[in-house]
Amino acid sequence: KGALTVTFTAPTERGTDRLILRLWPNGGPYASAGAHLFVSRVREGNRPLPVSYPDPTTLVIARPVAAGEQVVVSMNWRLLLPRETGLRMKGGGRSVRLGSFFPLLAWDGNDWALDPSTKFPSAEAWTTPIADFDVRVTQPAHLRVLASGQQIAPGKWRAQAVRDFTLALGRFEIVKGTAHVPASVRVTVGLEAFPGAEPVRLFLRRAILSLERYSALYGPYPWHTYTVVTMADLIGLTGGLEYPTLVYQPATSENVPHETAHQWFYSLVGNDQARDPWLDEGLATWAEAAVNGAPPFPDATIPPEVTNRIGEPMSFWDQFDTRRYFLGAYLQSSRALLSLGPRSQVDCAIRLYVIDNAYRIARPHDLLDALQTFFPDAEQKLEAYGAHF
């Protein structure tokens, strides 16, 4: 359980008639596994605010905010963790994982994001703005917390200019290193012990290599810390989970380059992950080759039912299994980018996309604008793969 205070400033050009926060533990596979996020005592100062719940994942606060006005709203929350493992939230056993676990402001820079949740346990359908987080955590003394941002004092964490906050609680083997991007970034890996777990220093080496390579290609990693937490209940390719400055990996396998690429594509440059999942997943899959030396799964065949559908929303992908979602949205989007021309030029265009859209919620036309600087026929080629602009 906890308490949350949110500060929101409406755009100077227009206001809003409400505030909306999303309660993601109440939807999709989380609710099915027994999770629930309760909210109480929503207030401004000492004044209670009226609220409504159009659906279990949506909290509407009836507080109009004029153009340029700043409002500070507080609330209490209580979370029941899911009974199942392998999700973005985990309780029980020897560890706890909390991802997108508290009421999240759903502002996309222009309006409120009201997309439904997805059925996939490791996928996400949320859109969140850049924010500064100051977090106080109380935990048993024998357990360690690893969290987004920096620990600034015992039990106090600060994460600046990020879209979300996550933490893991448990017993971890810790190793640390430094990436040069070129500024120094403190890299921490926490490994939850598990039979067959990969060596903890493998994760550290791959994290440092990925940060340095992507910083050279797409612009410097802008935060001071980066953390990789490997956990025993996460499995296979779908076990990687990305959050700003912290990612999760299965203890028995490693795909650090993909999750690290999300620090540029989702974290630094945001997107509506329900409407345009190819923007972050396709670009992260594309970027992997810069670290791994070759594109992933070069011999894989795209199933006909998802061929040339890269631009579809999560509501489309929800009808398929995880394998077809990966092949159709992740891998096929990467191949669509490769169809444009030389990889080095595509990387230059993506760097421009990052520069122009850092700390914003990007849309497909923002990526197209950057690509057309180098490839005038980019729209035609990407539309052939099913992109929508």
Outline where the language-model segments fall.
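Acidic/His/Gly-enriched intrinsically disordered linker/tail segments
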Residues: 275-339, 357-360, 378-389
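Solvent-exposed beta-hairpin/edge-strand motifs
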Residues: 16-48, 98-99, 138-144
